[in-house]
């Protein structure tokens, strides 16, 4: 099976980022995905890299990730997603969960 690699960049209203240098959550498995956040000085921007077997949903990925950036105000971060046929709502939920967990790690 061929995998599609997508790359996006988003402007962020904020430069809120995670404190750990990186954070990983999830497992690539049937209908799910894994996400990694990497802290990086990007002038407030967000870079997103997606590896997926699903062809033809580039615009959906872009809109979902743009919504995540706009909703959370996160910036100065690289988001890497390894997808295994997760639906858009599952992807959105997983990246929100990962950010919540990464933020919780900061409080410890």
Regions found by a protein language model. Give the residues of each.
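N-terminal intrinsically disordered, cationic/polar leader segments
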Residues: 1-108
């Amino acid at each position: 099976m061929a995998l599609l690699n997508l790359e996006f960049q988003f402007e962020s209203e904020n430069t809120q980022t995670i404190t750990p240098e990186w954070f990983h959550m999830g497992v690539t498995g049937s209908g799910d995905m894994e996400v990694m956040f990497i802290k990086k000085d990007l002038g407030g921007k967000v870079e997103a890299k997606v590896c997926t077997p699903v062809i033809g949903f580039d615009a959906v990925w872009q809109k979902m990730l743009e919504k995540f950036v706009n909703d959370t105000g996160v910036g100065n971060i690289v988001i890497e997603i390894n997808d295994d046929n997760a639906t858009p709502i599952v992807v959105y939920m997983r990246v929100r969960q990962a950010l919540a967990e990464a933020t919780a790690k900061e409080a410890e």
